[in-house]
């Protein structure tokens, strides 16, 4: 898919994948490989992740699931792809979670190929908090648009997001970063 308009036709604007694609495009993603899944399970996501990683041009991959089993399988697939020269960085997040829960999940995954994003976010035009996969999609889109990988992410404004569900103390931010969470403000 090369545009949000094209993505809307394929997956629908109101689907989770449609909303993720919108955020990725708003933040600068160019061409996006998307694979809809019928249910939130490791069995459903496995062929989707495999198909995307089989495309060697995939450099960033966003997971739409917040389930630990799905995220663990995602990490395994990304690590296996890297061994086959399929260099791809994954992005994922969680649903409603405390700072401690985010940190614990990131430590449990402990995957150098995955950017674990939190907390939940508010998307423009939405009243309910959106799962971490939406924040992950926005961040992946912004990183896809960057030409210089050495640029810091501090102060990066993600388009299409209006806020986060949690504001952490400095101590909590330090703990999140130490655990491997990319904490949004």
Residue ranges of predicted features:
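A glycine- and small-residue-enriched flexible loop/hinge signal that marks low-structured segments
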Residues: 44-185
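An N-terminal, globular interaction/scaffold subdomain
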Residues: 1-64
């Amino acid at each position: 898919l090369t545009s949000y308009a094209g993505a809307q036709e394929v997956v629908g604007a109101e689907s989770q994948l449609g909303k993720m694609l919108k955020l990725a495009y708003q933040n600068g993603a160019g061409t996006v490989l998307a694979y809809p899944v019928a249910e939130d399970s490791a069995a459903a996501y496995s062929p989707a992740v495999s198909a995307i990683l089989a495309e060697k041009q995939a450099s960033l991959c966003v997971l739409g699931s917040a389930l630990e089993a799905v995220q663990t399988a995602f990490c395994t697939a990304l690590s296996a792809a890297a061994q086959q020269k399929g260099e791809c960085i994954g992005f994922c997040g969680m649903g409603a979670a405390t700072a401690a829960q985010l940190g614990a999940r990131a430590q449990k995954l402990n995957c150098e190929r995955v950017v674990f994003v939190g907390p939940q976010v508010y998307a423009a035009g939405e009243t309910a908090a959106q799962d971490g996969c939406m924040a992950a999609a926005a961040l992946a889109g912004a990183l896809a648009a960057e030409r210089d990988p050495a640029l810091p992410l501090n102060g990066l404004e993600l388009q299409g997001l209006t806020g986060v569900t949690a504001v952490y103390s400095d101590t909590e931010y330090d703990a999140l970063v130490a655990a491997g969470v990319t904490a949004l403000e």
